[in-house]
Swiss-Prot record:
Its main location: cytoplasm. One of its GO terms (molecular function) is actin monomer binding. It is found in: Cytoplasm, Cytoskeleton. Keywords: Actin-binding, Allergen, Cytoplasm, Cytoskeleton, Disulfide bond, Phosphoprotein. The modification Phosphothreonine is found at T111. Disulfide bonds join C13-C115. It comes from Phleum pratense (Common timothy). Gene3D superfamilies: Dynein light chain 2a, cytoplasmic. This is Profilin-7. Belongs to the profilin family. Phosphorylated by MAP kinases.
Length: 131
């Protein structure tokens, strides 16, 4: 299965009539492996900050997390595994696997829980595959 298929069929899938605004699978260096049409372009320093937060949980909390210059307030996550952010009526979930970052961005009416489920389910699957 191609990386684009994972994005199209597993991240951008419909959940209770809703779907993510955008999604992607990136390498730990920020290289895009696959993405949805509207996925924002991360800046290198944003990826650096995200990876540092995985290594040092809480690193982004004081400043917020920036994604394509949009600022997200960092909310509860799983140290070293998941970063969650909130921005207005939407938010972001990033799941770290051995080689990748699985990213989902949502807006209402999709809920944070639905975004978390979609992103973390694929991330957990990739971890089980050694990826």
């Amino acid at each position: 299965m191609s990386w684009q298929t994972y994005v199209d069929e597993h991240l951008m899938c419909e959940i209770e009539g809703h779907h993510l605004a955008s999604a992607a699978i990136l390498g730990h260096d920020g290289t895009v492996w696959a993405q949805s049409a509207d996925f924002p372009q991360f800046k290198p320093e944003e990826i650096t900050g995200i990876m540092k937060d995985f290594d040092e949980p809480g690193h982004l909390a004081p400043t917020g997390m920036f994604v394509a210059t949009a600022k997200y307030m960092v909310i509860q996550g799983e140290p070293g595994a998941v970063i969650r952010g909130k921005k207005g009526a939407g938010g972001i979930t990033i799941k770290k696997t051995g080689q990748a970052l699985v990213v989902g961005i949502y807006d209402e009416p999709m809920t944070p829980g639905q975004c978390n489920m979609v992103v973390e389910r694929l991330g957990d699957y990739l971890l089980k595959q050694g990826l």
